[in-house]
UniProtKB/Swiss-Prot annotation:
Name of the gene encoding the protein in the UniProt record: ilvD
Catalytic activity as recorded in UniProt: (2R)-2,3-dihydroxy-3-methylbutanoate = 3-methyl-2-oxobutanoate + H2O; (2R,3R)-2,3-dihydroxy-3-methylpentanoate = (S)-3-methyl-2-oxopentanoate + H2O
Organism this protein belongs to: Tolumonas auensis (strain DSM 9187 / NBRC 110442 / TA 4)
Binding site for Mg(2+): D81, D123, K124, E491
UniProt cross-references to PANTHER family, sorted A to Z: D-XYLONATE DEHYDRATASE, D-XYLONATE DEHYDRATASE YAGF-RELATED
Gene Ontology biological process terms, A to Z: isoleucine biosynthetic process; L-valine biosynthetic process
Pfam families reported for this sequence: ILV_EDD_C, ILVD_EDD_N
Protein name, UniProt field: Dihydroxy-acid dehydratase
The UniProt record lists the keyword Metal-binding: yes
Length: 616
């Protein structure tokens, strides 16, 4: 029988000092034999996805105490990628993932906590906490802050739905008036919660359901809806049950590595492909798998991408549907149900509810004649009132969207595309692969060939696009923006948004060793590996080189000979210390970022630390 980790600090005469300190936090005699459960919150007033979390940690803590545990809350940092976008702040976004994972490990291990509830929401916070959960392998349950309501405004006498990306695109479009731009800015992000489309934050929160580490509705139930309060309350009760299963019954199936197995990771990427999730999820899933010693690689993602159709299309790939519409259609369980019926899931995997995936689908899939309770749960809709408060409204859709032929979520037979929403491409431009969100690519440019226009930084790319340097038919190359070269692997939301603003969204491609916001769409290919700073061929491309992209064939190539590539490589290596570095890029890189870059791997490895440099 495993001993409570916390016994190290709560038991024995020699721990009198530690117990004295625990008593100063509010613990009493009867508490020292109970599991100490960390409530890992991520409240901050900087991020709309986290601004409403301040009191929710204590909501969970009260439920933990009522269920027989001892709750202790701490906070992690949280970076808002949208606010950090387009300037030096974005260099810090991806590195914050590692910092979050480390900070959770530090707090949990320093204080010998027995289990944890992770209250996450936005882009790097959920993956950072997931990395920590797999690293620590103690009982855990995730509950996110929930998605934002979609924005709505009236333009040209028509009510339109919109989000953050629309504000960015319209702001750079000279044909949009100042008045309309201001109206969009004021309406795009109306409530607390993670941005309303299938961007990175919501994609990751949805994937926690597929991994088995959160409850149904975690990824889709609106932050503002009263129903979400129950997810937090039940998380408090369930974590005590999980802790008791492990520490009192020696049940290792309560641990995250027993739940988030290789089969669960395959289910998660199947879901990601089916729902057209953010390309960042690939980066994060690879990193999370490595933390849990799960054998899951780009090859697995490539294999799954060739089998799984796209069953759901949400903003930014369409403005018709946002996360509130996904929930109305049955949420993530509904997509998993369609994947299961298509024979594309491992349904014997378990979850934090103690159910198999098959049992979960049977109970919660709205397509299977569910209970009135389940129907009511998925009828939760937007309130339409700007607010920063959680659980502030109880509005409901008059009916569920169970149209699997033309609705938000579809069957395999009625899929938006039989070729899924993500694809792995490889060739001499990206020997170790790269990622494209095919859900956001117009059919007319699934095959594309054009001359390269090379930029050594995102800043130069933005200036070049807005300055008219990029023409229809060009392939924009943005390099030295990878994990090591940036450092920090910046998101390229501004370049992709400005291509649209300039009317080039469907007639140009953009390729980078950086990454893309979940809000990006178009022929945007990222995560090129190896990155330029690691000696990747993307660093050898010259202006005018013909670039060939073939998504159906999964290829991406520089149309020059191997001999020419070898000549260019030799010339690069001859530069000595200046080799594989950007030319004439002015960028301040802090000591903290340089330390991150020194250990960072390329995107095909999840941009995690290079363990070989640490003697492993």
């Amino acid at each position: 029988m495993p001993k409570l980790r916390s016994a190290t600090t709560t038991q024995g005469r020699n721990m009198a000092g530690a117990r004295a300190l625990w008593r100063a936090t509010g613990m009493k005699d009867g508490d020292f034999d109970k599991p100490i459960i960390a409530v890992v919150n991520s409240f901050t007033q900087f991020v709309p996805g986290h601004v409403h979390l301040k009191d929710l940690g204590q909501l969970v803590a009260r439920e933990i105490e009522a269920a027989g545990g001892v709750a202790k809350e701490f906070n992690t940092i949280a970076v808002d990628d949208g606010i950090a976008m387009g300037h030096g702040g974005m260099l810090y976004s991806l590195p914050s993932r590692e910092l979050i994972a480390d900070s959770v490990e530090y707090m949990i291990n320093a204080h010998c906590a027995d289990a944890m509830v992770c209250i996450s929401n936005c882009d790097k916070i959920t993956p950072g906490m997931l990395m920590a959960a797999m690293r620590l392998n103690i009982p855990v349950i995730f509950v996110s802050g929930g998605p934002m309501e979609a924005g709505k405004t009236k333009l040209s006498d028509q009510i339109i739905k919109l989000d953050l990306v629309d504000a960015m695109i319209m702001a750079a479009d000279p044909t949009v008036s100042d008045e309309d731009t201001a109206a969009v800015e004021r309406s795009a992000c109306p409530t607390c919660g993670s941005c309303s489309g299938m961007f990175t934050a919501n994609s990751m929160n949805c994937l926690t359901e597929a991994l088995g580490l959160s409850q149904p509705g975690n990824g889709s139930l609106l932050a503002t809806h009263a129903d979400r309060e129950q997810l937090f309350k039940s998380a408090g009760h369930r974590i005590v049950e999980l802790a008791k299963r492990y520490y009192e019954q020696d049940d290792v199936t309560a641990l995250p590595r027993s739940i988030a197995t290789r089969d669960a990771f395959e289910n998660a990427i199947a879901l990601d492909i089916a729902m057209g999730g953010s390309t960042n999820t690939v980066l994060h899933l690879l990193a999370i798998a490595q933390e849990g010693d799960v054998d899951f690689t780009m090859a697995d993602i490539d294999r799954m991408s060739r089998r799984v159709p796209q069953l759901c299309k949400v903003a930014p790939s369409t403005q018709k549907y946002h996360m509130e519409d996904v929930h109305r259609a049955g949420g993530i369980v509904a997509i998993l149900g369609e994947l299961s019926r298509a024979g594309l899931l491992h349904t014997d995997v378990r979850n934090v509810l103690g159910l198999s995936l098959a049992e979960l689908i049977e109970k919660y899939d709205v397509a299977l004649n569910p209970s009135e309770e389940v129907k009511k749960f998925y009828s939760a809709g937007p309130g339409g009132i700007p607010t920063t408060k959680a659980f502030s409204q109880d509005c409901r859709w008059p009916s569920l969207d169970v149209d699997r032929k033309e609705g938000c979520i579809r069957t395999k037979e009625n899929a938006y595309s039989q070729d899924g929403g993500l694809a792995v491409l490889a060739g001499n431009l990206a020997i170790d692969g790269c990622i494209v969100k095919t859900a956001g690519v117009d059919e007319s440019i699934l095959k594309f060939e054009g001359p390269a226009v090379v930029f050594e930084s995102q800043d130069d790319a933005v200036a070049g696009i807005l300055g008219g340097k990029v023409k229809a038919g060009d392939v924009v190359i943005v390099r030295y923006e990878g994990p090591k070269g940036g450092p920090g692997m910046q998101e390229m939301l501004y370049p992709t948004s400005y291509l649209k603003s300039m009317g080039l969204g469907k007639v140009c491609a953009l390729i980078t060793d950086g990454r893309f916001s979940g809000g990006s769409s178009g022929l945007s290919i990222g995560h090129v590996s190896p990155e330029a700073a690691a000696g990747g061929n993307i660093g050898l491309i010259a202006d005018g080189d013909l670039i060939s992209i073939n998504i159906p064939s999964r290829t991406i190539d520089i149309k020059i000979s191997d001999a020419e590539l070898a000549t260019r490589r030799a010339a690069m290596e001859a530069k000595g210390k200046a080799a594989w570095k950007p030319v004439n890029r002015e960028r301040f890189v802090s000591f903290a970022l340089r330390a991150y870059a020194n250990l960072a791997t390329s995107a095909d490895k999840g941009a995690v630390r290079d363990r070989s440099k640490l003697g492993e």
